[in-house]
Structure formats: structure tokens, C-alpha cells
């Protein structure tokens, strides 16, 4: 069976790197200090006691006490002089150095921990945000998008919200939209021009457009601002999707015979309880034995992985598949022997890059972050191949149940960049936490994106040995 599961109930170590090691944590915010001083000289003796034999413990302590005390006094006297000397040197350097010397604790944090533990680590916190940022759209639209997304952070300020800054952001976005109208519409294919023009008008003057958003901000109504902002960002995303009519990069020659998805697709998965129980009802809803989740799969960032998954869905490969719940994930059983499939290379798009990396995980130690992060509740990714972590499983996928409590202060999963994430749950996320081992995928359907799915006629050149 493919990793992260080595059997239906045993999970590979890859999926359990979710808790920071005590060895990793203990170096965070550690200040330099002397090995021991007067307050811990007793501790030193206790450590010495713990290493002595049972028969000679008392004699050893008695014989060493006087020697230790004298040496401690000598050491402490010298250490105080040393501390004064170090303090003098630091003051001298502080005065003459152009750089401040605060934040010395960062020297004790490895590059990986600096990213994982930094509260300023900027990764999308929702699937919708990650998917919107992943669209390879016109630069003007990206400027508009960034200006509006900044308002989302400003709205989180509990008191004295900076409405003036919010208004400036919207006006900046509006100016770019008006000044670059021709560039924005020129990026849209001819057959979609009419729809693009309609969306552009909505963005400027529509009910959920930028002008209306400025009005809401002037009224200083945070609820209306939030609703208007969401509507404007949805319109921005719709325009960007029209501009991104296909892949913005060429696939490597060796992967041209793989199924691929050149854009977005939507998959609807119906899950059925196996033990006769029911899913908890939503507000005003009824108890039900089956529930539906929708996921958006992203071929812009993971065309091979999303394409292979879409192919399996359309062939009915997941219909009737059993689900297993493991630590922070819901994963399908291994069904690679039941369907014709091949292992797809590990595929991760680094943030700021124009094409994915293949068979190479991201190095968080070097500050690399993925366009589609795993650290989002409801992220959908392929498990590893049972033969090599450079490849994804040909069949097994999992829903990642992200929990901030099991992540670094920066909100990153400790497995970030190690799996091929290819989509996010956009509807039915409340269902994921209710799934139990043994529940069944009743059906999986590709309800949108069939026209973007390419299925090569011949797959003879695909290496199936992985």
C-alpha cells in the first residue's frame, strides 16, 4: 500500500511528522547562560550523584563537597569578571555597529524552525485564498487582488479598525482596474470577451464591486465591508480564471504521456456511513446517512496530479472505496490493484516560481513555501508511493485535517512541502471531521472541468515500476 499508509490501519512516519520534537523546541528563545551558578550548584551535585555507584555514593559526595564548593567559588568569581568583560564588549560594539544587536535568540533557531515558528510566515489560511493566489493571471489583476486581500487582515483588528487604510487600498485597486482596462480585457480569449466585459463592469460598478466597497468602508460597518470584500474578490477570481485559459508553462518531455488537467475542475464526493449512524445535521437540516463534499482540483499548480485524480474519478475508481481515519487525515484505502493506474511524480509548485518541481520536495529549511500549502483544513493531497517518496501513490489520496495546535507558530504543518497537494475542500468541510474508519465513498463525480482534462491515447512510455 502506498505511503502514508503501509496498511489499512498502519500509518507511515511521513504523516506523523506533525508534532514538533522537544529537541526542536528547546532551542527556541534560549538565552546564553553559564553552565551553572550558585543557585544550581546543588543540581550539579545531584547530577554527580545520579552517575555514581550505589555503594560509593555517600563517600563520593562527602569527599567532593569541599572541593566542589571551592572550585565553584573560584569559577563564579571568574565568571563575574567574564560577564563584565562581555558586557563591556557588547556595549562598545552596540555603539559602533550600524546594526542593532537585539534578537540574538534567532541565532539559536535553525532556518527550518525560523520558518515553521515565525508568526509572520505568510501562507494562505483558507482553500479559497490558496486557490485564488494560484491562478496565473494578468499582473494588473494580481495587484488588484493583493490590495483587496490586505483588507482582510485589517478587518481582523479588534478595535479602531484602520478604515482610512482600507479605503486607500480599494482606491488603489480601482485606479489600477480603470487605468489597465485594456490590458485586463486583452488577456481574455476572444470567445470569452463578452463574459469578461460583464465581469469587469461588475467589478467596477456592480453591487459587490469596488465603488460599493468604498461606500461600505466610509460607513465603517465591518460586516458590510466583509461581505463587499468577499464579493469583490470573487469577481476578481472569476476574471482571473478567464485570463488563465491553460497552463502557463510547458510540461517536461518525459511527462507528456501522463493525464493532465489544464486548469480547474470540481469533484463532488458522496460519503456514506458504514455503521448505520448519521452525519450531524447543519443548522435547520436533517440527520442523514450520507453527505457530500466538493473539492476544487487545481491543474494550474499540479497538472499531472490533478489530471490523474480526475481520470480516476471519471472512470469510477473511487466508487465504493473505504476510508480510514488517521492522525489529522482521512485517507482512502489502497485500491491501486483494482484499477489501471501509474505512479505520478511528486509535484509541488514553489511560491514565486512559474512551474512545479518534480520528484523533489520543497526545502522549508531554505524558506521554500508551496503555492498550494498542506497547512489548510480540507487540503487534498496524494499519499506517497509505497516504493519511493519521489512519487505519489497512483490511487490513494487524503483529506488533511489541519490543526494549528499541532503546527509551528507560523502555522505550518511539519510535513509542509512533502506531498503533492492538488486541491481543497470548498463545501462540506464540516463533514470531514465526522468521517470514521470504514465509511465509504458512495460516488465521486467530476462535475466541472471535463473539457480541461487531457487523456493521452498511449501510456506505453510511462514508467510503471514506481
UniProtKB/Swiss-Prot annotation:
Aerial parts. Keywords: Chloroplast, Isomerase, Plastid, Rotamase, Thylakoid, Transit peptide. Its main location: plastid. Residues 1-65, 66-114 form a transit peptide. It is an enzyme of class 5 (isomerase). It comes from Arabidopsis thaliana. It is found in: Plastid, Chloroplast thylakoid lumen. The keyword Repressor does not apply. This is Peptidyl-prolyl cis-trans isomerase CYP37, chloroplastic. Induction: Up-regulated by light. Down-regulated by dark. The lineage of its organism: Eukaryota, Viridiplantae, Streptophyta, Embryophyta, Tracheophyta. Residues 278-466 form the PPIase cyclophilin-type domain. SUPFAM superfamilies: Cyclophilin-like.
Amino acid at each position: 500500500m502506498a505511503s502514508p499508509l503501509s496498511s489499512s490501519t498502519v500509518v507511515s512516519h511521513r504523516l506523523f511528522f506533525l508534532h514538533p520534537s522537544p529537541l526542536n523546541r528547546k532551542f527556541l528563545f534560549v538565552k546564553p547562560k553559564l553552565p551553572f551558578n550558585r543557585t544550581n550548584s546543588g543540581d550539579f551535585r545531584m547530577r554527580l550523584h545520579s552517575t555514581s555507584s550505589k555503594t560509593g555514593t555517600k563517600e563520593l559526595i562527602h569527599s567532593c563537597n569541599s572541593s566542589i564548593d571551592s572550585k565553584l567559588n573560584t569559577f563564579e568569581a571568574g565568571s563575574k569578571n567574564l560577564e563584565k568583560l562581555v558586557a563591556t564588549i557588547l556595549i562598545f560594539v552596540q555603539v559602533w555597529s550600524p546594526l542593532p544587536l537585539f534578537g540574538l535568540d534567532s541565532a539559536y533557531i535553525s532556518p527550518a524552525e525560523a520558518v515553521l515558528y515565525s508568526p509572520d510566515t505568510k501562507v494562505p489560511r483558507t482553500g479559497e485564498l490558496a486557490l485564488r493566489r494560484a491562478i496565473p493571471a494578468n499582473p494588473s489583476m494580481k495587484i488588484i487582488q493583493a490590495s483587496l486581500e490586505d483588507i482582510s487582515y485589517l478587518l481582523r483588528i479588534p478595535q479602531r479598525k484602520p478604515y482610512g487604510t482600507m479605503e486607500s487600498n480599494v482606491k488603489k485597486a480601482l485606479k489600477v482596474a480603470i487605468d489597465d482596462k485594456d490590458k485586463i480585457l486583452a488577456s481574455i480569449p476572444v470567445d470569452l470577451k463578452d463574459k469578461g466585459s460583464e465581469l469587469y463592469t461588475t467589478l467596477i460598478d456592480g453591487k459587490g464591486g469596488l465603488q460599493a466597497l468604498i461606500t461600505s468602508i466610509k460607513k465603517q460597518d465591518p460586516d458590510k465591508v466583509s461581505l463587499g470584500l468577499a464579493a469583490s474578490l470573487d469577481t476578481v477570481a472569476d476574471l482571473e480564471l478567464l485570463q488563465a485559459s491553460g497552463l502557463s508553462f510547458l510540461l517536461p518531455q518525459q511527462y507528456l504521456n501522463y493525464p493532465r488537467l489544464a486548469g480547474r475542475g470540481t469533484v463532488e464526493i458522496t460519503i456514506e456511513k458504514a455503521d448505520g449512524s448519521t452525519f450531524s445535521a447543519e443548522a435547520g437540516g436533517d440527520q442523514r446517512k450520507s453527505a457530500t463534499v466538493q473539492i476544487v482540483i487545481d491543474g494550474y499548480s499540479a497538472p499531472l496530479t490533478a489530471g490523474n485524480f480526475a481520470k480516476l474519478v471519471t472512470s469510477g475508481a473511487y466508487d465504493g472505496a473505504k476510508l480510514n481515519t488517521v492522525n489529522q487525515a482521512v485517507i482512502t484505502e489502497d485500491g491501486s490493484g483494482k484499477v489501471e493506474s501509474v505512479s505520478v511524480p511528486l509535484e509541488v509548485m514553489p511560491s514565486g516560481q512559474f512551474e512545479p518541481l518534480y520528484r523533489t520536495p520543497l526545502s522549508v529549511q531554505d524558506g521554500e513555501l508551496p503555492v498550494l500549502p498542506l497547512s489548510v483544513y480540507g487540503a487534498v493531497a496524494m499519499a506517497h508511493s509505497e516504493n519511493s517518496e519521489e512519487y505519489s501513490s497512483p490511487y490513494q489520496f487524503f483529506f488533511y485535517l489541519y490543526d494549528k495546535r499541532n503546527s509551528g507558530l507560523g502555522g505550518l504543518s511539519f510535513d509542509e512541502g512533502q506531498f503533492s497537494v492538488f486541491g481543497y475542500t470548498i463545501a462540506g468541510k464540516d463533514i470531514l471531521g465526522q468521517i470514521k474508519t470504514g465509511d465509504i465513498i458512495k460516488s465521486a463525480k467530476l462535475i466541472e472541468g471535463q473539457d480541461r482534462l487531457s487523456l493521452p491515447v498511449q501510456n506505453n512510455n510511462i514508467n510503471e515500476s514506481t
